[in-house]
Amino acid sequence: MEEIQRYLQPDRSQQHNFLYPLIFQEYIYALAHDHGLNRNRSILLENPGYNNKLSFLIVKRLITRMYQQNHFLISTNDSNKNSFLGCNKSLYSQMISEGFAFIVEIPFSLRLISSLSSFEGKKIFKSHNLQSIHSTFPFLEDNFSHLNYVLDILIPYPVHLEILVQTLRYWVKDASSLHLLRFFLHEYWNLNSLITSKKPGYSFSKKNQRFFFFLYNSYVYECESTFVFLRNQSSHLRSTSFGALLERIYFYGKIERLVEVFAKDFQVTLWLFKDPFMHYVRYQGKSILASKGTFLLMNKWKFYLVNFWQCHFSLCFHTGRIHINQLSNHSRDFMGYLSSVRLNPSMVRSQMLENSFLINNAIKKFDTLVPIIPLIGSLAKANFCTVLGHPISKPVWSDLSDSDIIDRFGRICRNLFHYYSGSSKKKTLYRIKYILRLSCARTLARKHKSTVRTFLKRSGSELLEEFLTSEEQVLSLTFPRASSSLWGVYRSRIWYLDIFCINDLANYQ
């Protein structure tokens, strides 16, 4: 019981992290700007001249005026710009949020680096490989084929801003930082909607995404910390890879309210969740909880999670946001793939003396397919084809040079083949390749004011050799002996550890 209470106590080493003075340091905002340059998603990139405007004095005046009066309240007549120190008011709110996000990430980054260095000493994994989207699929491929049921969970988002502030109260000990964060969030709420709920999951407003994603991740970690604690306590077999994946999304947070619960009836509570084959994965505002247990056990987990979110976070969380599905009878949209566990039947003939037997053996296999209908819908939205999949020209690219047009189409095709290299069946990818190739030909023909047949006859079919996918090139170099018959290799799944994001088709440059 002492170990449980020690786990739930706030870390004493974090009690002297005074972050408020760092807000007034100019180099913090410069580092945040450089960090955004590296990640290519900083709000400050839209305002490259801010370095000449931002200074210690401006930040101090801005925070002072925030406390003195409601300078962030925007009238209905002028919802975009107001005169505030001669600049856009929204721009300065974004600057402070970028700087504050960079500051609060410092303790987490130091803790993550120390944990990764301890793992790297054992040469278990490379930390940058865990950043790849494909790093999750080998884990699912190795474990999900042995499981029976899965909980599909739609993670609730905090509807109250105070919940976001309280997730950081255990390690941010200076009251000034918490007060500034609380005040800034409530004032920013009047400017823009922090979270929009148009989609079934969650989505943040385009401004200040890094700041609010940090708050959201810290909130989600507090939700997950109890589950991870119960999972580790109920099983004596701790997987090293599981611990590595946990460090990837590690955020410090403790739950004091559960101390009394564990102290009173911890053994009974622990017995309900004792399952050594429990696996958890979070992605895109959703999470899945898979187990080898029975339907009754998964139903207990479902009601436990509902009660936990309702009691601890005061959220109105309904049971309809959690669905129990059997892996063998259910396919799910997971990170752009249609993943499922299907039975692969195999017939074995056994000969014993004069008698022979036919043994039907079914093996579970984790299957990943390319969702053709959503993918064609994305191509149609980007004006590469119709909703039925018929290729059309791209008029907005007809003013470019021939090499640029071919390069853009080829880059999209190669990226799609690269991301969907883990598909069990590549036939869908070759259909997408056909759509993009013919769309490219029609775009070039439109530019030269001729038909596709006439253009290809005049230019030669070698003009579209750009569509030799990167997967085919890599496989031909990796397996030179099998270059003549790579059909068996094409059917195998290949997961790459260099895919860090998924871009919209319309934004490919």
Swiss-Prot record:
Listed GO biological process terms: mRNA processing; RNA splicing; tRNA processing
Which GO cellular component terms are attached?
chloroplast
Q: Does the keyword RNA-binding apply?
A: yes
Give the GO molecular function terms. Answer: RNA binding
> Which controlled-vocabulary keywords does the entry list?
Chloroplast, mRNA processing, Plastid, RNA-binding, tRNA processing
Q: Does the keyword Chloroplast apply?
A: yes
As for subcellular location, the record says: Plastid, Chloroplast
InterPro entries annotated for this entry?
A: Domain_X, Maturase_MatK, Maturase_MatK_N
Broad class of where this protein is predominantly found: plastid
Protein family (similarity comment): Belongs to the intron maturase 2 family. MatK subfamily.
- Record-linked HAMAP family: MatK
Q: What does the record give as the function of this protein?
A: Usually encoded in the trnK tRNA gene intron. Probably assists in splicing its own and other chloroplast group II introns.
Q: What is this protein called?
A: Maturase K
Q: Corresponding gene? A: matK
